[in-house]
């Protein structure tokens, strides 16, 4: 396919037009006074959103050169969302500001490579300063504040996320689902939960709820299938003598072994329940080892060299309570040593850090959550499907922002932290175009606060000047109340990770755009005209008319 090429200033200006178009759409959503964007969908009702990355992902421009600029800024937004889960609009505002200001200097004759170096050095110094002014998240109240700000000042969402984190801990799993009603609610599953239910309904102890509830049971964790009763019988007799319930977790239980368990359950000889092990392959083995550690038992595998007929009571795990339904099993309060669980958690954390697969990372985080505390489910309710989707997106944003805050701490919100970190650029001893690049970042970090003020109908430059004149580093402009106040006390906070990621990603892409000298795109194909075939058809019809006149 033929290509079209643009060079120098023509190329950079085309990229700038694309950057400005996507930035104009995205930055209108910034802050509590930001506006909604309505996105048309081919199927179903239009999507209404205030989420920057959602808006950015929908934008595709007609001009291929302008579209390149738009897509690169979209990359800033997406990357920030992937790393921190929030701050996508801030990242877009920063990227546009750095690129526009930098392009002005390149046009005036500055060396783009030196500008890029200065931009990156200034961004790194601001990031280090942000880390210094960062404050750790210590209380549930601070978690609620972060979540409220990220959810566009929805206190209900903020409080529910804080409650969920309080119950399952910072390593616990919190999932977001659509509710059937209009209320937003929180459900918490304590203990280890996995998606495998009983192998036979005859194991049920509560006919109303169709659940098998085992109080203070012994737990067998077996890697292979159990189908030979002869090997299993010695252990069954030992457990029956103890008089305690018995949970069997194995790859599968079938044939005479399963039939014997069912008969013993029906006769009341033994309160027993059998379930399949969760997962597949190596992940199944790892999850069974997790269950063994949680319950203080052994995972009976071929590697250990222990045969089923030789398993003793001391090899079994124990728990305070086990609830098994048709589709899932929940083990509450396993009798493990806390040191063993901590060691396992540390091991999984190392695996999360080392893995390069997003899928593996997600599964490892699920395992970590199940060991660490439990699973919380936030059911998002709303009056209409459109409102529910918009609200669910805000809950997801708030959840990611809260995790980021717990990880790296918080800084004053409302764009103030970036302005307070400006002073770090003054300490850099740069010369020439590198110093110019640093000054570009110095001015760009004011852009988020300026945009917040503009969206609220205020004069951005005046607000920035007033904030810079304040002596208390936590003081700034609260857009929600239209007041200058201590933002940390007022609960206007941003996660350090979000602010840091937004600046780093914006500086990276803007620097690359500035050093662009040539852009190449596919040449659009000319649409072939179908006039010729239409004319010949008409001619044929005319001939037929002539025949009719004869």
UniProtKB/Swiss-Prot annotation:
EC assignment: 5.6.1.7
Binding positions (ATP): 29-32, 50, 86-90, 414, 478-480, 494
Source domain of life: Bacteria
InterPro entries: Chaperonin_Cpn60_CS, Cpn60/GroEL, Cpn60/GroEL/TCP-1, GroEL-like_apical_dom_sf, GROEL-like_equatorial_sf, TCP-1-like_intermed_sf
Cellular localisation: Cytoplasm
Primary localisation category: cytoplasm
Catalytic activity: ATP + H2O + a folded polypeptide = ADP + phosphate + an unfolded polypeptide
Keywords, in A-Z order: ATP-binding, Chaperone, Cytoplasm, Isomerase, Nucleotide-binding
A Gene Ontology term for the protein's cellular component: cytoplasm
One Pfam entry name: Cpn60_TCP1
Any one biological process term the GO annotation gives: protein refolding
Molecular function terms from GO: ATP binding; ATP-dependent protein folding chaperone; isomerase activity; unfolded protein binding
Job of this protein: Together with its co-chaperonin GroES, plays an essential role in assisting protein folding. The GroEL-GroES system forms a nano-cage that allows encapsulation of the non-native substrate proteins and provides a physical environment optimized to promote and accelerate protein folding.
The protein's assembly and partners: Forms a cylinder of 14 subunits composed of two heptameric rings stacked back-to-back. Interacts with the co-chaperonin GroES.
NCBIfam families the record matches: GroEL, PRK00013.1, PRK12849.1, PRK12850.1, PRK12851.1
Family, as annotated: Belongs to the chaperonin (HSP60) family.
Name of the protein: Chaperonin GroEL
């Amino acid at each position: 396919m033929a290509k079209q090429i643009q060079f120098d200033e023509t190329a950079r200006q085309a990229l700038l037009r694309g950057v400005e178009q996507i930035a104009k759409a995205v930055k209108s959503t910034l802050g509590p006074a930001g506006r909604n964007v309505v996105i048309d969908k081919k199927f179903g009702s239009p999507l209404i959103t205030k989420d920057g990355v959602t808006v950015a992902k929908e934008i595709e421009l007609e001009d291929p050169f302008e579209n390149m600029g738009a897509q690169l800024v979209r990359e800033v937004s997406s990357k920030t969302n992937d790393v921190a889960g929030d701050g996508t609009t801030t990242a877009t505002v920063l990227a546009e500001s750095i690129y526009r200001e930098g392009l002005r200097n390149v046009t005036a004759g500055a060396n783009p490579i030196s500008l890029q170096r200065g931009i990156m050095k200034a961004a790194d110094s601001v990031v280090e300063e942000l880390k210094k002014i960062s404050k750790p998240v210590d209380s549930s109240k601070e978690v609620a504040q972060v979540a409220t700000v990220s959810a566009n000042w929805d206190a209900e969402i903020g409080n529910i996320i804080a409650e969920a984190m309080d119950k399952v801990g910072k390593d616990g799993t919190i999932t977001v689902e659509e509710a059937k009603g209009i209320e937003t609610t929180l459900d918490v599953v304590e203990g280890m939960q996995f998606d495998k239910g009983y192998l036979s309904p005859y194991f049920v102890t509560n006919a109303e709820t169709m659940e098998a509830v085992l109080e203070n049971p012994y737990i067998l964790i077996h890697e292979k299938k159990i189908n030979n009763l002869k090997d299993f019988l010695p252990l069954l007799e030992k457990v029956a003598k103890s008089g305690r319930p018995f949970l069997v977790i194995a790859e599968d239980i079938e044939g005479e072994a399963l039939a014997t368990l069912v008969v013993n359950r029906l006769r009341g000889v033994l309160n027993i329940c059998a379930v399949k092990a969760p997962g597949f392959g190596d992940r199944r083995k790892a999850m069974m080892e997790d269950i063994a550690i949680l319950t203080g038992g052994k995972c009976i595998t071929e590697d250990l060299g222990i045969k089923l007929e030789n398993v003793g009571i001391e090899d079994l795990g124990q728990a305070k309570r086990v609830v098994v339904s048709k589709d899932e099993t929940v083990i509450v309060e396993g009798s493990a040593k806390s040191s063993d669980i901590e060691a396992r958690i540390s091991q999984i954390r190392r695996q999360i850090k080392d893995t390069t697969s997003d899928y593996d990372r997600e599964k490892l985080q699920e395992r970590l959550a199940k060991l660490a505390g439990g699973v919380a489910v936030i059911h998002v309710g709303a009056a209409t499907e459109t409102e529910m989707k918009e609200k669910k997106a805000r809950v997801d944003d708030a959840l990611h922002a809260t995790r980021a805050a717990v990880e790296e701490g918080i800084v004053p919100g409302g764009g103030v932290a970036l302005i307070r970190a400006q002073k770090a650029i003054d300490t850099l001893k740069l010369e020439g175009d590198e110093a110019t690049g640093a000054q570009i970042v110095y001015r760009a970090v004011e852009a988020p606060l300026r945009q917040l003020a503009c969206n609220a109908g205020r004069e951005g430059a005046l607000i920035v000047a007033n904030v810079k004149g304040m002596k208390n580093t936590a003081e700034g402009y609260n857009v929600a109340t239209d007041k200058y106040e201590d933002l940390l006390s007022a609960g206007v906070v941003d996660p350090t990770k979000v602010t840091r990621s937004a600046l780093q990603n914006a500086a990276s892409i803007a620097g690359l755009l500035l050093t662009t000298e040539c852009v190449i795109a596919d040449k659009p194909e000319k649409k072939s005209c179908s006039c010729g075939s239409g004319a010949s058809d008409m001619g044929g019809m005319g001939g037929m008319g002539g025949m009719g006149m004869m």
